[in-house]
């Protein structure tokens, strides 16, 4: 695998290489730009975004660009777009990952007829901004079976030669004979002590979509990405039903909170806290304030506050609708000022169809949320756009008190 230089622009989405036309902003306090549109630029869909802000202030968005509608296991590239003016304008989409040679298909997906030989799948790219080193680290997977590390020292113009780190995942085999691995998705974190921490999930690939059943853990680096180690298994199915895409954040006392996607009937996000981001995890609890529509969310620390975003599609359970409404819609952001004990304020970013999201902030007080949005379809949702919202933290505080 190699990471490409900035020499492979993808067909631009609009004349002049700005953004897809902006959707109307909710208020003058939030600016929303559409960066990708389905069936444009040579790809059928754009999914699973991640966002970070480099130490120099460049906003960087990376996405999975899917050539067909065959889901997670189809032909996928990784594209990047960057903004050098706080999200006002964006450069052209560029493919940044390419594998040399023929890629072996994932045996679990092949057994379920989800993929076929010759199909190259790049997935779950994870950025980590590292101000102390002046770099942005990246982890990425291929075929949900191999993992790589690279970094950029010039805001995404070039990347270091990638290093395969699949051996880090091999260390899980003594506890769990995985067939499927995935980093993130979304951004990882740099702890205040310098440790790089990336949540991961693994599956034996025997269940639905070859992504289930599953376990959650972390991998970490204490030497700036040069080497990576595995953490303890945090939780596994059936202790928590199919835990997967997990978010990490450093709390005010230096401990690390994980916020875990799951398929439990509680329909609430699962939370655990550990001292170092790798071990000593507390008993899993459900956060009653944070709805789980079985979808990736995002978690970010900004000063003394925590921000959490995901589709908050709550409709109360009733005799007519005993399960309530757990569709991917009504993307909302909440704020906590007590390390996630309570989430008193909420704002809606996208009231309609919405899905995966990720959060970042810059040194000028701007918060960025990249997210999937779209249109209703026979299957419930259809991701048509990838958009970026920019706002200030006071915009959230001015929202509805919960």
Walk through the language-model features, giving the residues of each:
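C-terminal motif of bacterial Sec signal peptides marking the signal peptidase cleavage site
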Residues: 14-16
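Positively charged n-region of N-terminal signal peptides that target proteins for export
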Residues: 1-4
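Asp-box/BNR beta-propeller blade signature and adjacent active/binding-site loops
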Residues: 18-402
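Gram-negative bacterial Sec-dependent N-terminal signal peptides
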Residues: 7-12
């Amino acid at each position: 695998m190699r990471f490409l230089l900035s020499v492979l622009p993808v067909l631009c989405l609009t004349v002049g290489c700005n953004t897809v036309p902006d959707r109307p902003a909710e208020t003058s306090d939030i600016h929303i730009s559409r960066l990708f549109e389905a069936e444009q630029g040579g790809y059928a869909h754009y999914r699973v975004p991640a966002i970070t802000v480099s130490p120099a202030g460049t906003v960087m968005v990376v996405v999975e660009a899917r050539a067909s509608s065959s889901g997670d296991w189809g032909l996928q590239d990784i594209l990047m777009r960057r903004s050098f003016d706080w999200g006002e304008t964006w450069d052209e989409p560029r493919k940044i990952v390419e594998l040399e040679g023929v890629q072996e298909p994932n045996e679990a997906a092949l057994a379920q007829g989800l993929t076929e030989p010759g199909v190259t799948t790049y997935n779950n790219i994870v950025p980590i901004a590292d101000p102390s080193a002046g770099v942005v680290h990246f982890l990425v997977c291929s075929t949900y079976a191999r993992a790589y590390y690279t970094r950029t020292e010039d805001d995404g113009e070039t990347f270091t030669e990638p290093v395969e780190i699949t051996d880090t995942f091999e260390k899980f085999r003594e506890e769990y004979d995985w067939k499927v691995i995935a980093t993130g998705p979304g951004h990882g974190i740099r702890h205040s002590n310098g440790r790089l921490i990336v949540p991961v999930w693994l599956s034996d690939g025997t269940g639905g979509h070859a992504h289930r059943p599953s376990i959650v853990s972390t991998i970490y680096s204490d030497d700036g990405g040069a080497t990576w180690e595995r953490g303890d298994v945090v939780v596994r199915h059936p202790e928590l039903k199919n835990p997967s895409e997990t978010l990490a954040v450093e709390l005010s006392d230096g401990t690390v909170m994980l916020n875990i996607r799951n398929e439990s009937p509680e329909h609430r996000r699962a939370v655990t806290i550990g001292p170092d981001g790798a071990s000593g995890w507390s008993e899993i609890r459900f956060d009653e304030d944070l709805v789980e529509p079985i979808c990736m969310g995002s978690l970010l620390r900004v000063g003394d506050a925590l921000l959490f975003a995901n589709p908050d599609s709550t409709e109360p359970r009733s005799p007519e609708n005993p399960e309530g409404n757990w569709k991917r819609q009504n993307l909302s952001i909440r704020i906590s000022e007590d390390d996630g004990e309570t989430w008193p304020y909420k704002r809606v970013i996208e009231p309609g169809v919405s899905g995966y999201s990720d959060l970042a902030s810059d040194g000028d007080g701007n918060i960025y949320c990249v997210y999937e949005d779209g249109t209703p379809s026979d299957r419930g949702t259809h991701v048509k756009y990838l958009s970026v919202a920019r706002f200030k933290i006071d915009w959230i505080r001015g929202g509805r008190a919960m």
